[in-house]
Structure formats: structure tokens, C-alpha cells
Amino acid sequence: MKKISVLFVCLGNICRSPAAEAIFLNLLEKRQLTDGFIVDSAGTGSWHIGKKADSRMRIAAERRDINILSRARQINSKDFDEFNYILAMDNSNFRNIQDLKNRTASTGFASIKKLQDFRSVSNEQEVPDPYFGGDEGFDSVLDILEDSVNGFFESISWIYLISVSLGILSL
């Protein structure tokens, strides 16, 4: 059976995208839906490949009972074929993802969107990068990510339910 695949992307894959990945996995676990999804995160840059998420983000997430376990990697051309959804954290990430897809002439079917577009209260155009700020910035970003990830899930939940009912996916 096929699974719905989601890739979260930020600049270095050590703050926003691994947090979004962990939040989405946590949401799926609470709903007992992890078997129907493949979830990952990546960065547009290569500076942090193989490293854990920023300790400030991990600590802020742990206070919410969210464990960030992934290691940083860089997005690549195969991702356009392997993921149904690629969700960028900001406009720069979005452009870099589009540029990579165009440069590699990928024929992949991935739907590339900005995660912020799924936020229930869209008063910001992007998920801000907390890397150079203080600890409070990480909590603020987690608030935005939780809201946006929930909105994304709600937007695709009907696809999941229809796919299960048609036997394309299993529970």
C-alpha cells in the first residue's frame, strides 16, 4: 500500500524543518496514523549535514513533549519523486526548492507549498528563522509550526480518508 509522503524544508535543517517534522509525527502518533505516512525534513543548504537539530529548538520542543530526533540532510532531486508534499518554511526556501526542481529537470509530482499558507491566523508571510535570536524565538516559531502543521493535516486528511476507503492506503 502507498503512503502519503511529506518533506519539511528550511535553510539548514536544524531548527524549523526538523521541528515541523517532529510536530507532524507527534500529531500522527496521537491519531494512530503513522503507518499511512512517510515524514522527513531537509535543508536547502549543506552546512549542517549529519548534525542534530539546534539544542535550543530541541529543548523548546521537549517542553511540549515533542522529540526532535532527525539528523540534518540536504534536499536533492530524488525528493521530488519520493514526496507528495514538500513544504517550505519561507519564501527563500520556496524559491530554492523551485530552482532545484528546475535545474534538475525533475518530472516529480511533488506539490511544493509554503507551510505558512496552512496557518489558521496568517499574520506573517513566513515561518521566521529563530537561529540568530534568543530562546523566546524558538517558542514563538513552535507556536507557528504547530498551528501550520495542524492546518496542513486538516487540508490533507480528506485525501487520506478517501485513499483508505478506496484501498489505496491502509490504516
Predicted regions located by residue number:
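Conserved active-site segments centered on acidic
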Residues: 1-83, 157-163, 168-171
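Phosphate-binding/catalytic loops
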Residues: 85, 91-171
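Helix N-cap/beta->alpha junction signal
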Residues: 17, 90-91
